[in-house]
Amino acid sequence: MKVIDFHTHPYLSGEEFLNFYPECFEPSPTQLREDIGKAEICHIAGSVLNKRSYTAEEGFAYIRECNDKALELKRILGGFYTPGFHVHPHFVNESIAEIERMNSLGVKLIGELVPYMHGWSDYSCKELCTILDAAEQYGMTVSFHTMKDEQEEMTRMIEAHPKLDFVAAHPNEKEYFLLHLERLKKYDNFYLDLSGTGIFRYGLTAYGVKKVGSEKLIFGTDYPICNPRMYVQAILQEPITDTDKENILFRNAERLLKTT
């Protein structure tokens, strides 16, 4: 069965290799491709993150560096990779210019946005709203990290931009997963990727399918933080239909990423 990993953080070198045990690997784009291939994943998407901490002094130059590395990985990996890029509410004009630049290059995926790594937090702030207004004009998709203490802010962001598709990352534990399910029922433009914490709880995916349907759930791993093969097997083991598995593992991602 085809598998698309909607949520990865690819890397050029050890500087971008977000893994708890980096001494066990020799990170490079070639190693990434081989590693992902072992899990029989045929396509990946996601933003580049840097192990070097963000500072206000470095500002948007830090953000642009991550985005440029995503473009370089796209050059190396070709059709195997859909790059995601970062924006930042402290830099509205620069972020809008980055949206325009990426759109001109055919890049339509914002994120995964990871506010806690980049010195901001409020998904409903007016500055991010202005940036997302611009993204709406280009038909982009926004992937964002679930901020567990930002439940109302996440909802306001989704409500304010009905023409954007939003994908929250990580089901988390049951308390927060149930909150996501309520949003999935309510908003046609909202999806959940199953990366990170969550799907090792057996039955979580089947419960989500029962409550909202498999069309709103998207496969992701959070590689290289998480073991990609384990996540593939977690979906295949769930008591859901083959059609549901296909929707989750690749069809929903194909629709959002506009890949075939």
Give the positions of each predicted feature.
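Mid-to-C-terminal alpha-helical segments outside catalytic/metal-binding sites
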Residues: 1-10, 15-43, 214-216, 229-260
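Mobile, glycine- and charge-enriched loop segments
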Residues: 1-22, 67-86, 188-191
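Conserved, mostly hydrophobic/aromatic
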Residues: 7, 36, 70, 102, ...
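A cross-family glycoside hydrolase active-site/sugar-binding cleft signature
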Residues: 7, 47, 84-86, 111-113, ...
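Divalent metal-dependent hydrolysis catalytic cores, especially in the metallo-beta-lactamase
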Residues: 8-9, 30-56, 81-86, 108-112
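Acidic-and-aromatic substrate-binding clefts and catalytic sites of carbohydrate-active enzymes
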Residues: 21-27, 52-62, 87-95, 117-124, ...
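Active-site gating/metal-coordination segments in enzymes
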Residues: 58-141, 199
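Catalytic pocket-lining loop regions of alpha/beta-barrel enzymes
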Residues: 108-109, 122-218
